[in-house]
């Protein structure tokens, strides 16, 4: 469903950051439990898991590349989750190196099962290929799945 040209199922950067940050909260009395969105964005930027563009434009629609970057950096910085040593399973993603800066973020999340790949049929043959689809916009449902997968990883470590 579209409202004035934008899909209402698409999640914004700010909404995603708010929901992801809930993974960090430890106690109901944690001062972070009362943080406003502008304060949260400033905090994330200061800590290094958000970029300037995320803080300045929280209403921007979230794409998969941005979600991977934010999620990876959040897990690394706020939850102290270390990188996997072997990310070779991610090399089957045909577009992994579309963004060389993002490649490790995407590979880490893909190998942990936090974000998935999409199968695409290049032609009528049966040789489907896996793609991350960097610039595809994320729906709220997909974002909630990513956050649930992060929660599972958090508890498994």
Residue ranges and their predicted role:
Residues 1-68, 72-105, 116-140, 149-157:
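Feature responds to low-complexity, polar/acidic, surface-exposed segments characteristic
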């Amino acid at each position: 469903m579209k409202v004035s040209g934008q899909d209402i199922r698409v999640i914004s950067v700010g909404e995603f950051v708010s929901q992801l940050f809930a993974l960090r909260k430890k106690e109901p009395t944690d001062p972070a439990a009362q943080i406003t969105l502008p304060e949260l964005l400033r905090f994330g930027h200061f800590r290094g898991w958000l970029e300037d563009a995320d803080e300045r434009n929280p209403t921007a629609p979230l794409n998969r590349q941005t979600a991977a970057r934010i999620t990876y950096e959040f897990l690394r910085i706020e939850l102290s989750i270390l990188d996997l040593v072997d990310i070779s399973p991610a090399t089957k993603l045909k577009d992994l190196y579309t963004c060389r800066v993002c490649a490790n973020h995407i590979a880490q999340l893909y190998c942990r099962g936090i974000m998935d790949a999409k199968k695409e049929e290049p032609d009528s043959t049966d040789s489907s290929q896996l793609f991350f689809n960097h610039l595809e916009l994320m729906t709220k449902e997909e974002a909630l799945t990513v956050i649930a997968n992060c929660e599972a990883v958090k508890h498994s470590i």
